[in-house]
């Protein structure tokens, strides 16, 4: 199966990444990616873009040469209460909201604290996808998180970058997450977590984990633009309606 959607990418606006939106569009055309989300790090990260970057994402075209662009953020989970570093009505302007633990913002603590923080983030209703929940630096109660995500309709990410250049040792946790997701009916999504355009749509390692766990690939959000856009619309992102209309016209 060709997976046509990538929900997790970073641009030069996060200065430890190396590609522009234009770069991603070119690679998307080459790889058959029909929809990707630009999700730079939230403002609490030291080298993250300014708050205005996210407010002004509305200037991005909806579609360029058949490739759709989702306006998003990878926010930072800030504390045990599940608060993130983006807020209020500005969240409603975004098409997609990712959030995860990042050491410069929320240093690792203990399993119980990580679990409570992640579940509170899930319950907040502000976040659509939890990024790299298999990070071994942040052990969690996987079953508890998977159950909460299933209950609140939040997706858990299997992060391809975690098996290549970041978060070494994530394989066992991610396999357990995929197995728990299968058991509890939790939505999974693969994210490239691309920091350079060449890795856009790179899901090979994540897909191997999902296969090994026996999670049904027919339930992955990456299957098509309509699947992801339907998920986002159901979660209250009315901003995606015009993008869905463009894909409908292209059929």
From Swiss-Prot:
Which UniProt keywords are listed? Answer: Hydrolase, Metal-binding, Zinc
Pfam families given in the database record: PHP
Entry EC no(s): 3.1.3.-
- SMART domains recorded: POLIIIAc (SM00481)
Please state what class of enzyme this protein is. hydrolase
Please give the GO cellular component terms listed in this UniProt entry: cytosol
Q: Where does Zn(2+) 3 bind?
A: 74, 102, 132
Q: Which amino acid positions bind Zn(2+) 1, per UniProt? A: 8, 10, 74, 193
- UniProt entry tagged with the keyword Transcription: no
Q: What is one GO biological process annotated to this record?
A: bacterial-type flagellum-dependent swarming motility
Q: Which domain of life is it from?
A: Bacteria
Report the cofactors. Answer: Zn(2+)
Cofactor binding notes: Binds 3 Zn(2+) ions per subunit.
Q: Which GO terms describe its molecular function?
A: phosphatase activity; zinc ion binding
Binding residues for Zn(2+) 2: 16, 41, 195
Q: Which family does it belong to?
A: Belongs to the PHP family.
Concerning NCBIfam families, the annotation shows: PRK09248.1
Protein name listed in UniProt:
Probable phosphatase Sputcn32_1369
Lineage, highest ranks first: Bacteria, Pseudomonadati, Pseudomonadota, Gammaproteobacteria, Alteromonadales
């Amino acid at each position: 199966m060709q997976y046509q959607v990538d929900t997790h990418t970073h641009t030069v606006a996060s200065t430890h990444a190396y590609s522009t939106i234009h770069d991603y569009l070119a690679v998307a055309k080459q790889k058959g990616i029909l929809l990707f989300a630009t999700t730079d790090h939230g403002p609490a990260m030291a080298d993250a873009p300014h708050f205005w970057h996210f407010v002004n994402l509305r200037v991005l075209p909806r579609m360029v040469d058949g490739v759709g662009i989702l306006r998003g953020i990878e926010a930072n989970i800030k504390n045990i209460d599940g608060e993130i570093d983006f807020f209020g009505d500005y969240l409603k302007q975004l098409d997609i909201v990712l959030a995860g633990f990042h050491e410069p913002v929320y240093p690792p603590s203990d399993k119980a604290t990580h679990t409570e923080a992640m579940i509170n983030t899930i319950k907040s209703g502000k976040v659509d996808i939890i990024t790299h929940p298999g990070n071994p630096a942040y052990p969690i109660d996987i079953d508890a998180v998977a159950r909460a995500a299933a209950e609140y309709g939040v997706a858990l990410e299997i992060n391809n970058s975690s098996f290549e250049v970041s978060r070494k040792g994530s394989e066992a946790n991610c396999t357990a997450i995929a197995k728990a997701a299968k058991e509890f009916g939790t939505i999974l999504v693969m994210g490239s977590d691309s920091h350079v355009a060449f890795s856009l749509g790179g899901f090979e390692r994540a897909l191997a984990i999902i296969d090994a766990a026996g999670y049904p690939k027919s339930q992955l959000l990456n299957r098509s633009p309509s699947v992801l856009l339907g998920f986002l619309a159901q979660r209250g992102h009315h901003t995606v309606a015009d993008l869905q209309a463009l894909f409908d016209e292209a059929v």
